[in-house]
Amino acid sequence: MIFADRIAAAEQLAEALAEYRGRQPLILAIPRGAVPMAQVIAARLEGEMDVVLVRKLRAPGNPEFAIGSVDESGWVYLADYAAAAGADEAYIRDETAAQLETIRQRRIQYTPVRPPHDPAGRIVIVIDDGLATGSTMIAALHALRAKKPAELI
């Protein structure tokens, strides 16, 4: 779908998720593009907002193309085409380490004075501003399932 901008997309998404209004959902944004969207959705649904930190693993020679992703715990998702894109074990190990360091720095930046909100037993809605390969969403959902939300949307 095409939207005028991220805020317009967030407003339409909040409308589609209206059944969760007043149920204190936890809206988790995949930074950076989804953060303003999650703020709008959290306000409309009367929920809390936080971030879920994941990073794409970039293809060799093509940093915009995801060959996989990593979550904050270090769990790695690799697309079945990663090797065909030129990513060998050493490249994946180094790229994973680099992205985990970025995640560590972003955790300090996004939640410097408090721990992340705990999704356990809560309705959790994950927001991203696009799903080109779906890699970062796969990692985000994997990370969140391990934390036992009541519902994961």
Spell out what each predicted region is.
Residues 1-153:
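PRPP-associated nucleotide enzymes
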